[in-house]
Regions:
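Conserved N-terminal segment of class I S-adenosyl-L-methionine
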Residues: 1-94, 98-102, 113-115, 221, ...
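A structural helix-start
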Residues: 51, 108-112, 132
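Short, glycine-/aromatic-enriched active-site segment of Class I SAM-dependent methyltransferases
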Residues: 10-13, 128-150, 154-162
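Residues lining the SAM
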Residues: 102-105, 131
């Protein structure tokens, strides 16, 4: 992401429905599958809200390839920070029990190498918690603006993760309730030749609260069951 996107992330991630719901789901999956006091690595940590919210569960390390992102992390009181690329993580082999990668894999040119690096730094039986955009047909100017390389089909993500040495515990679509609306908006935008810009903007307190309530209801479903389609994919896997 460019500097402007990190600035927007820092301003919005504690309030905007998308960031809050995604982060709460990721943290919940860590609580469900990772013992307390584990060493947790948040890769592609962005402005640091996820790492901050993971801190009560274990010893959290945060890594990003942007120094600007790490500056925002410091403002959130985070100190175990590393500047690094997901394809060449600056961590020892077998040094953490959990890796969290929320909407990161799509930013990496070589996703196979990134998953191998995640497997390398995890201890045996270590846990990966991951989210990533779903359905190539939803590709839009939003993806271009955020420097995505791809969106994933569930079968493709499963194959990639398993070939990297993981056993999949959970693999589900997410943002299920809003999928029809997002799909229509993306397809119409493509037909109209919409320009490349991130589709994240403040929508007002009322709509934001409503969307967050919907996503929290959906997150409760995801604790127990997989969903058949959605804008994103979420995964839990063990090395």
């Amino acid at each position: 992401m460019n500097a402007e996107e990190y600035d927007r992330l820092f301003r919005m991630e504690d309030h905007y429905w998308w960031f809050v719901a995604r982060r709460e789901l990721g943290v919940e999956f860590v609580r469900m599958h990772v013992p307390r006091h584990a060493r947790i690595l948040d890769v592609g940590c962005g402005a640091g809200a996820t790492a901050r919210d993971l801190s009560p569960h274990g010893r959290v390390f945060a890594c990003d390839l942007s120094e600007r992102a790490l500056t925002f992390c410091r403002q959130r009181g985070l100190h175990a920070l590393s500047l690094g690329d997901l394809q060449r993580l600056p961590f020892r082999t077998g040094s953490v029990e959990c890796v969290v990668a929320l909407d990161v894999l799509e930013h990496v040119s070589d996703d196979e190498q990134a998953l191998r690096e995640i497997a390398r730094v995890l201890t045996p039986n270590g846990v990966l918690v991951l989210s990533t955009p779903a359905y190539p047909l939803l590709w839009s100017g939003h993806d271009v603006a955020l420097h995505h390389f791809r969106r994933y089909r569930r079968a493709r993500l499963r194959t990639l993760v398993e070939q990297s040495g993981f056993n999949i515990v959970r693999l589900s679509y997410a943002v299920f309730l809003l999928f029809p609306f997002v799909a229509i908006a993306r397809l119409v935008g493509r037909l109209l030749g919409g320009r490349s810009r991130a589709g994240l903007w403040w929508i007002g307190d009322g709509p934001n609260r409503l969307l967050l309530a919907l996503m929290r209801w959906e997150n409760r479903l995801l604790r127990r069951a997989d969903l058949p389609w959605g804008v994103s994919l979420v995964l839990v896997a063990r090395r």
